[in-house]
Design a protein with these regions (language model features):
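Helix-loop-beta element that forms the nucleotide-linked donor phosphate-binding surface
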Residues: 146-147, 153, 159-179, 187
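Active-site proximal beta-strand in glycosyltransferases
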Residues: 91, 103-127
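Short hydrophobic beta-strand element within catalytic cores of glycosyltransferases
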Residues: 291-294
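Conserved acidic donor-binding segment of nucleotide-sugar-dependent glycosyltransferases
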Residues: 308-317, 325-331
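Conserved donor-binding/catalytic core segment of Leloir-type glycosyltransferases
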Residues: 188-205, 209-224
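Aromatic "clamp/platform" in nucleotide-sugar-dependent glycosyltransferases that forms part
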Residues: 274
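Membrane-proximal helix-turn-helix segments that form the acceptor-binding/catalytic region
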Residues: 130-151
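Nucleotide-activated donor-binding/catalytic signature segment of Leloir-type glycosyltransferases, i.e.
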Residues: 232-257
Length: 372
């Protein structure tokens, strides 16, 4: 089977796409991969070098939520239709909801990694203000959901959110994200420290919660590259854990190997997000045997269940208390680290994710063939 996949290099979708593409090719599939957003750096595409059955087509079409997204959506749609005509895939795997209604004679599966309306609700606690752009966006996504052969979400919460915002799809499926466990080291001796990933200025990730109270153990936040917008708290920007008033150190973007080392050393991972449909970084932390301390939101409760410690929703005091309790009880910390590790290996591994997608591909393709 030949699958055309769309992706972008702006966030964790690229990591998810890499795991899926590698898994599909290992099972005999051919993959044409199209990326949007930004042209990736060479280190972001190095993984493709060993894949003979992968054709990669990078583009700079902007995503639907970016400035100029409306025009680029039209141009991107025309480009994809032409590419489908040229490459003749058996199925489209579209990692952007807006393209679900492409006028092409092949099945279309779209994956809801996130969207602007559900993001806004989660971050601001209210509906977004009406505008000409929002009207276009709602109409585009609703049409895409209605026309797609299947809509996939990485959690039941996200599937329900998409359904309530844009209507029901012809076929709905929940397929959890997955990572290859062999990439992570769960056996290194842990340091009594907390790791978090996200920009301090990102209201959805809200890692800034970790800076609002004095922490009892060192905390490292990765991804806060803009020093001018940091909260007013004493933090250091070097590569060592800070012993400042907040016990927080801030690092810029890290390579994957650097991140894996940080995961392997940190005893705890703080998932502070108020909007997290999938939680890829938490999967990576769990596969590194970090104990998870998570914001108490429905999506994270659904994904991690009893394999994590939860703090009161969006509450910095409760987060600091959870860190204090877990760091002070080594047996409890190891217990939760092992729970997260086992759950991630069983439920959120790349092999299982790929198998689930292949099953869906075959169902959708056979249904289309029968209908024809």
């Amino acid at each position: 089977m030949h699958v055309l996949i769309t992706s972008d290099t702006m966030n964790g979708i690229w990591t998810y796409t890499r795991e899926l593409a590698c898994g599909l090719i290992a099972r005999g599939f051919r993959v044409t991969l199209v990326s949007f957003g930004e042209i990736p750096m060479p280190e972001q595409t190095a993984w493709m070098d060993r894949l003979q059955d992968l054709r990669y087509v990078p583009t700079a079409f902007r995503l639907d939520w970016m400035d100029g997204g409306e025009q680029h959506f039209e141009e991107g749609s025309e480009f994809l239709c032409a590419l489908v005509k040229e490459t003749k895939p058996d199925l489209l795997h579209l990692n952007h909801l807006c393209y679900g209604a492409l006028s092409v004679p092949v099945p279309r599966i779209v994956v809801a990694h996130g969207d602007m309306v559900t993001w806004w609700r989660a971050v601001h606690g209210r509906e977004p203000k009406e505008s000409a752009w929002l009207k276009w966006y709602r109409k585009t996504i609703s049409h895409a959901v209605a026309e797609a052969d299947a809509v996939v979400a990485p959690s039941e919460w996200m599937q329900c959110a998409v359904r309530s915002s844009y209507g029901a799809a012809a076929r709905e499926s929940v397929i959890h994200h997955g990572r290859n466990p062999v990439l992570f080291n769960p056996y290194i001796q842990k340091e009594d420290s907390v790791l978090a990933i996200g920009r301090l200025v990102d209201p959805a990730k809200q890692v800034s919660l970790l800076t609002l109270q004095k922490q009892t153990v060192p905390v490292c936040i990765v991804g806060a590259e803009n020093a001018d917008h940091r909260p007013q708290a004493l933090m250091r920007t070097d590569v060592k854990f800070s012993d400042g008033n907040t016990g927080v150190a801030v690092r810029g973007a890290q390579t994957e190997s650097q991140l894996r080392l940080l995961y392997s050393k940190a005893a705890m991972y703080a998932g502070t997000a108020r909007y997290e449909p999938s939680g890829m970084t938490m999967i990576e932390a769990a596969l590194s045997r970090c104990a998870l301390i998570l914001n108490d939101i429905p999506a994270l409760r659904e994904i991690w269940g009893q394999a994590a410690v939860y703090f009161r929703t969006n509450d910095a005091d409760s987060l600091a208390e959870a860190v204090r309790i877990l760091s002070g009880d080594l047996q409890m910390r190891r217990n939760f680290a092992n729970r997260a590790f086992q759950r991630a290996r069983e439920c959120f591994n790349a092999h299982r994710m790929t198998d689930n997608y292949i099953q869906l591909y075959r169902k959708v393709a056979s249904q289309q063939a029968w209908a024809a």
